[in-house]
Design a protein with these regions (language model features):
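ATP-dependent carboxylate-amine ligase catalytic core
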Residues: 29-35, 56-139, 143-156, 160
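Buried hydrophobic packing segments
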Residues: 54, 58, 106, 222-230, ...
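Hydrophobic alpha-helical packing residues
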Residues: 54-59, 188, 339-340, 391
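Acidic, Mg2+-coordinating active-site environments of NTP-dependent enzymes
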Residues: 109, 136-257
């Protein structure tokens, strides 16, 4: 009889967990039904920006909308408050169950619309996130690029399959104009879902210049297509997007005046894969031809993002002419080996500053800065943000608030 006691306890505990899980599922479903609109923003790059822009559009259209970004600088954005709320995570870190609490808090606040950046990476988690938790009527796929290949890959085909699995049934989907457009359309047709293709040609350079931070046409065309899917007119959408605030870590150019020649710091950490980084590089070359003639490319590496480092080695560094390539952070070995094997023939030189302090990185950079662009790529996590702050302090520029404590300024 004594031997049965532990088994009984385990069985009762398991039964209790099942009961609690079922109860939570029912509560979440009941809360979800109270929302008129739910949007799931998926993709590789630009999800946080799209979430902010779509949230602003819904607010302008009169919805009581809550937006939620995820990742490094997770934030809750409210239609009725000027301050954003930092998402404080439990010790175990990011979990898709966090989304249940987001839906609950949005409903308690009186929201009738919710826009959420997809926080799941693994394909099976993405499926659960969309079809069992948020059940969004509109999915937005910003792009399909190489990243998170260890969890979603090994190729972009698998990434596209994962994103397609989050297309709703009998709803709407916004998709990019890319090699997977027809595939996404076919999945949407099977599910009885309307398709809206983002059209970058609808966004002019003149419009983008009205923002006080840098955006690509695609950032806005995705949000504009979402507005169309939601039945919100173009004029309302364009006006609303201008009121959305930048995500922490958004692309910005910082000019520093130096006695021997001005330099420009480009914070491109958020574009943490080669394709988006090359898009930014093309903007840099177009706007700053003299400073970009002999650039400094500063990459912050992470030990848990070695695949990302390999992607930069293969697809980014060889395409930047006359660059001083500086590797900082941890696990810089792939860059060091590639340089030793002559894989960066167009580079000026390579400097390995692995595990060096931000102060040491700054001291190394100082004599190289005059007349140059410093483009910061790779990862903001780890040494990235402290190095950026060290550079801005050296240039006597006001520091952006740390990404974990970003506050919104008034819209009025």
């Amino acid at each position: 009889m004594e031997n049965l006691l532990p088994l009984c306890v385990c069985a009762l505990s398991l039964a209790l967990l099942v009961v609690l899980g079922c109860a939570e599922k029912r509560r979440n479903e009941a809360n979800r039904k109270k929302l008129r609109v739910a949007v799931n923003v998926n993709g590789i790059r630009g999800k946080s920006t799209a979430t902010r822009l779509i949230t602003a559009i819904l607010a302008e259209a009169g919805y009581r909308v809550v937006g939620k970004t995820t990742g490094t600088a997770a934030r809750m954005i409210f239609w009725d408050a000027e301050d954003e709320q930092e998402v404080v995570r439990r010790p175990h870190g990011i979990s898709i169950s966090e989304q249940i609490q987001v839906i609950n808090s949005a409903v308690k606040r009186g929201a009738d619309a919710l826009v959420c950046e997809c926080m799941a990476v693994r394909p099976d988690y993405q499926r659960v996130y969309q079809h069992q938790i948020i059940n969004a009527g509109l999915t937005v796929i910003t792009n399909v690029l190489e990243d998170h290949l260890d969890e979603m890959g090994p190729t972009t085909d698998q990434i596209a399959w994962a994103f397609a699995d989050t297309i709703p049934y009998n709803g709407a989907v916004v998709i990019p104009d890319c090699e997977y457009t027809e595939y996404f359309k076919s999945v949407a047709e099977e599910r009885g879902t309307r398709v809206f293709v983002a059209d970058d040609s609808l966004i002019s350079e003149e419009y983008l210049k009205q923002f006080d931070y840098r955006l690509f046409p695609h950032n806005c065309s995705v949000a504009l297509a979402a507005a169309n899917a939601l039945g919100i007119d173009r004029e309302t959408a364009l006006s609303a997007m201008l009121k959305a605030h930048a995500d922490p870590g958004a692309l910005r150019f910082y000019d520093i005046s130096l006695p021997k020649g001005d330099c420009c710091i480009v914070n491109a950490f958020a574009a943490n894969e080669p394709s988006s980084s090359l898009d930014i590089w093309n903007i840099v070359c177009s706007e700053r031809p003299e400073q970009s003639a002999n650039p400094i490319i500063l990459m912050n590496c992470r030990p848990d993002r070695v695949d990302r480092t390999k992607q930069f080695v293969r697809d980014f560094f060889p395409k930047i002419p006359n660059a001083v390539i500086i590797a900082a952070g941890e696990s810089t070995g792939n860059i060091t080996k590639a340089e030793a094997h002559g894989r960066f023939p167009n580079a000026d030189r390579y400097i390995n500053l692995e595990k060096q302090s931000p102060e040491k990185v700054l001291e190394t950079l100082k004599p190289l800065l005059p007349g140059r662009i410093v483009m910061c790529v790779g990862n903001i996590h780890g040494s990235g943000e402290p190095i950026l702050h060290a550079l801005l302090e050296y240039g006597r520029l006001p520091l952006p608030e740390p990404i974990f404590r970003e506050r919104r300024k008034s819209r009025h």
